[in-house]
């Protein structure tokens, strides 16, 4: 008995140590979380922390190098403060990414629920549209739409919202069909609850974790897509500025004033990388098959 009790008491601290290690957030994830939080704070407080107007020009201070006491990140070819434009670009790019991700999630989840509920013809139509969307290069579609209809902020956000909806539709459809076959959803339906109530109140909360992980995958992709469109001149238009817009304008001065292009390029790289790392960490935490 004494040997058994000693061995049991010795095993308890080991288990506790392993549990604490599992609960500890990795350093890389913590750094990614801090970076993304800083980006959100900058986007919210852009009007208060921006030192100059993004359209304010000073031809006497053209192409000032970073480190100047009045222009910490230097100036561009017409004397505009790079830091001020970078802060505004972060706000615009995050606004587009957040809006488009929410639209894509709502659209795909709704369509997926409709396919799971009605099945048959509706399901076949949804799956066909999802296959078509997945096979179509979205950048070419976006370029065609923006070139034909012109570009405005509302149109750009709505167009970006069409990106990746088929991913959410497939996830929502598959998980909704699986959840509907389980006892709790069938029991609520037999009690007389409406299908819309069953999907919103019982099925959606059970698949929310998977949708959140998918959103962390879509968000950086939309940032890169918007940056590509703005780089090509079909995204955000002057006087507004976005990260891709700044990279597009700065490429002409890459050899003489590389800071104009490198500052927004590094923000794009670190932001998309941090969200991808957070997405992988959330997937490991929320996916029951990995636990």
Q: Predicted segments — roles?
A:
Residues 1-37, 277-291:
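Transmembrane alpha-helical segments of polytopic membrane transport and secretion proteins
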Residues 30, 34, 38, 42-77, ...:
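Hydrophobic alpha-helical transmembrane segments of membrane transport/permease proteins
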Residues 31-45, 99, 103, 107, ...:
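Lipid-exposed faces of alpha-helical membrane segments in multi-pass integral membrane proteins
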Residues 72, 82, 108, 116-117, ...:
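Generic hydrophobic transmembrane alpha-helix motif, especially the helices
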Residues 75-80, 117-118, 133, 177, ...:
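Short helix-to-coil transition segments within interhelical loops
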Residues 82-114:
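Transmembrane alpha-helix signature in integral membrane proteins
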Residues 145-148, 160, 175-176, 217, ...:
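Glycine-rich helix-loop "coupling/hinge" segments at transmembrane-helix boundaries
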Residues 163, 209-217, 258-291:
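C-terminal transmembrane helix and the adjacent membrane-cytosol boundary/short C-terminal tail
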């Amino acid at each position: 008995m004494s040997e058994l009790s000693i061995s049991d008491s010795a095993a308890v601290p080991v288990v506790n140590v392993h549990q604490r290690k599992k609960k500890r957030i990795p350093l890389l994830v913590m750094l990614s979380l801090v970076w993304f939080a800083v980006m959100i704070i900058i986007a919210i407080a852009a009007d208060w922390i921006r030192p100059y107007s993004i359209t304010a020009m000073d031809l006497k201070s053209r192409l000032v190098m970073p480190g100047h006491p009045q222009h910490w990140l230097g100036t561009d070819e017409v004397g505009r403060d790079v830091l001020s434009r970078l802060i505004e670009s972060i706000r615009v790019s995050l606004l587009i990414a957040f809006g488009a991700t929410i639209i894509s999630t709502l659209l795909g989840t709704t369509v997926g629920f409709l396919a799971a509920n009605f099945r048959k013809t509706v399901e076949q139509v949804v799956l066909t549209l999802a296959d078509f969307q997945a096979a179509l290069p979205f950048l070419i579609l976006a370029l065609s739409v923006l070139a034909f209809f012109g570009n405005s902020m509302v149109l750009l956000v709505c167009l970006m919202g069409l990106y990746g909806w088929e991913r959410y539709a497939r996830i929502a459809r598959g998980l909704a069909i699986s959840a509907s076959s389980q006892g709790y959803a069938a029991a609520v339906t037999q009690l007389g609850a409406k299908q819309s109530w069953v999907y919103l109140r019982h099925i959606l909360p059970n698949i929310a974790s998977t949708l959140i992980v998918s959103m962390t995958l879509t968000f950086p992709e939309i940032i890169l897509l918007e940056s590509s469109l703005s780089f090509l001149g079909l995204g955000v238009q002057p006087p507004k500025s976005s990260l891709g817009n700044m990279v597009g304008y700065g490429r002409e001065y890459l050899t003489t004033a590389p800071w104009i292009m490198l500052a927004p390029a590094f923000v794009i790289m670190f932001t998309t990388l941090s969200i991808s790392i957070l997405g992988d960490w959330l997937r490991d935490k929320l996916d029951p098959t990995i636990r």
